[in-house]
């Protein structure tokens, strides 16, 4: 049976000493609950999975594409989305990625984006928000629980032995 194996990309930095030591490998995540060093690394990882057709967040999503439009770093009159995705029924998903937990305004931001997209871009389809971050606080968890349009995910890095 097949198992998903998650890989953590490593960032190489050359060691500039005279003995030509091997480059030091620095993980792209830090320990503090395990988090990505930048939102771009998290976004790259998620984009790779969506482009490969992998089911993410328990929903079969693909990155939004229309003539002249692509859903990564999607710019619209109210701001810029990390990722705009859609499900097989054409419902839209606004995905906001945060590398850690210090974003108290994430819920409010996504709620405003959902309202704008529902009014201007949904064409009768539904619009949902997904917030993905490390270690969400209780206030964010409660806000999302009260809003059927939102889902909250905590990312985790795991390793599985292949036998």
Question: At which residue positions do the language-model features occur?
Answer:
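Charged, terminal alpha-helix-loop-beta segments
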Residues: 1-163
């Amino acid at each position: 049976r097949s198992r998903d194996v998650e890989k953590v990309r490593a960032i190489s930095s050359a060691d500039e000493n005279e003995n030509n030591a091997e480059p030091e490998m620095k993980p792209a995540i830090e320990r503090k609950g395990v988090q990505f060093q930048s939102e771009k690394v998290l976004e790259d990882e998620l984009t790779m999975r969506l482009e490969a057709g992998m089911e993410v967040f328990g929903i079969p999503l693909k990155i939004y594409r229309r003539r002249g439009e692509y859903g990564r770093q999607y710019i619209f009159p109210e701001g810029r989305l990390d990722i705009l995705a859609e499900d097989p029924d054409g419902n839209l998903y606004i995905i906001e990625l945060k590398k850690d937990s210090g974003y108290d305004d994430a819920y409010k931001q996504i709620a405003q984006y959902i309202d704008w997209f529902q009014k201007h871009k949904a064409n009768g389809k539904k619009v949902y928000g997904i917030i993905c971050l490390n270690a969400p606080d209780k206030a964010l968890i409660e806000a999302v629980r009260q809003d059927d349009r939102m889902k909250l995910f905590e990312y985790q890095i795991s390793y599985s032995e292949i036998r």
